[in-house]
Amino acid sequence: MMGCLPTKQVGRSTHSLNPREAVALAAETSFTVNEVEALYDLFRKLSNSIIKDGLIHKEEFHLALFRNKKTNLFVDRVFDLFDQKGNGVIEFDEFVRSLSVFHPDAPEEQKAGFAFKLYDLRQTGFIERHELKEMVLALLDESDLNITSDAVEMIVDRTFDQADTKGDERIDQEEWNEFVKNNPYVLRNMTLPYLKDLTMVFPSFVIHSEVSEADMVA
């Protein structure tokens, strides 16, 4: 159904990135202008892998992350958080802003906030026990780990024992921030090291960049 959307209204009609947009996105994220341009090249490939309309649909997102189109709660949640406008697709500016959270230089508070929203499935402002369990099961489903249901319950119980300091059977943002501060391993998947070397992954952008880094100062 998404493929039936009129691409004139939401898609991109050109194959080049507006230099002003590159500068603006670099100014509000952890990326340089050259890296934003490299991300645009990646975005174009992903957004035309199945439905050729210059937008990343959920099927394309699944394929990019896990090389399959299998439905999974974890992938769905990440997609929903990338889709900041809530229109069922990921546009380029959303792609850059969301990926910036995973940049090695992004503040830990941003990473913690994104992870909190990931687990807050019902978007109530709290992580409840059943939500944490659902997400743990979804993560295990995408991994090669074979863990018993008792072990899953143990993970959930241990997390709540440490994080739910108010003892109300739910974890709020403040409790979560303190929990990840004491358990930094929780956020280890929130950093993608290669995002710091995008111009090495796409070296042509260093040479052919349409915007110089000096323009960032203006």
From Swiss-Prot:
Reported tissue expression: Expressed at low levels in roots, shoots, culms, leaves and young spikelets.
Stored PROSITE patterns: EF_HAND_2 (PS50222)
GO MF terms, alphabetically ordered: calcium ion binding; kinase binding
Gene Ontology biological process: calcium-mediated signaling
Induction: By salt, drought and cold stresses, and abscisic acid (ABA).
Domain of life where this protein originates: Eukaryota
Cited Pfam families: EF-hand_5, EF-hand_7
Transmembrane segments: none
InterPro entries hit by this protein: CNBL1-10, EF-hand-dom_pair, EF_hand_dom
Site (Involved in dimerization): 143
Gene3D superfamilies with a match to the protein in the record: EF-hand
SUPFAM superfamilies, alphabetized: EF-hand (SSF47473)
Domain EF-hand: 35-69, 70-105, 107-142, 151-186
Keywords attached to this entry: Repeat
PANTHER family per record: CALCINEURIN B, CALCINEURIN B-LIKE PROTEIN 5
Record family assignment: Belongs to the calcineurin regulatory subunit family.
Function: Acts as a calcium sensor. CBL proteins interact with CIPK serine-threonine protein kinases. Binding of a CBL protein to the regulatory NAF domain of a CIPK protein lead to the activation of the kinase in a calcium-dependent manner.
Subunit annotation: Homodimer.
Protein name (database record): Calcineurin B-like protein 5
